[in-house]
Amino acid sequence: MAGLESAPAARPSLTSISSGELRSLWTCDCELALLPLGQLLRLQPGAFQLRGDQLVVPAPAEPASARGGFNVFGDGFVRLDGQLYRLSSYMRRYVELTNYCDYKDYRETILSKPMLFFVHVQTKKDSLKERTYAFLVNTRHPKIRRQIEQGMDMVISSVIGESYRLQFDFQEVVKNFFPPGNKVVNGEDLSFAYEFKADALFDFFYWFGLSNSTVKVNGKVLNLSSTSPEKKETIKLFLEKMSEPLIRRSSFSDRKFSVTSRGSIDEVFNCNLSPRSSLMEPLVAELPFPCVLESEETPNPFI
């Protein structure tokens, strides 16, 4: 199904969608998106900054993070235009959880912002040169959010009181996006996983690897690459709307996305692509989760 939705002929792009049509799109109409990393850095200077040999991403405690942004998944480094940069702050693609509070914080954290993964591609024209793309996962789109939430809910219901490992994989949908002849070099990096270790005396299924699950996330990929100044401005507003802060609700059930719910969460999905005019509303409370977030100021307890 993912291959059919992401076939080159049907792939939504800025060459097939006019500027006016793109302005009328709801943010929730964008399930997944791809654009050159360099273009993303230029369009989102508040969310990403190149400082020397570092690609700086605002940490949860920094004011810029409270204004929105992305959950960047990586291994600490990213290559751009042949140069290797260190990530100053990012989320690890694999974490271990040992209690319900950690699980709850992790779940809320990964769903609080759009996800970003780095994609390295060898083109058909020049197989020796890699291009770096940013792959965006809109966790506020009902289709994407449903796949993540249902994956987490289903594995819990099947392994009550036992340890388990759950992985979310985007390799197939990304590889199907690019035309034949282009090679995704780092497909294994297009995933994230967590392992919940329960305090069970006999964890046979976990010991033998029978409680490992993988959810292959599928969706329609929007091509946000463009050289047109007008369309670049539209893309900028589009990205800002996608990454606006998500307001925390009073209970978990209230925070779950519903197309019929009313209130601030649905403001993210209106047709107005202008940036939020006021930041005086309560913003999502960032979660101090040291085993998830990597930064140069925070020691990594898993290395």
Curated annotation (Swiss-Prot):
Q: Where in the cell is it found?
A: Cytoplasm
Q: What does this protein do?
A: Involved in processes that promote adipocyte differentiation, lipid accumulation, and glucose uptake in mature adipocytes.
| UniProt KW keywords | Cytoplasm
Q: What is its main location?
A: cytoplasm
- Record protein name field: Mesenteric estrogen-dependent adipogenesis protein
Keyword Cytoplasm set for record? yes
Disulphide bond pairs: none
* Any one Gene Ontology BP term: positive regulation of fat cell differentiation
Q: Cellular component GO terms, alphabetically?
A: cytoplasm
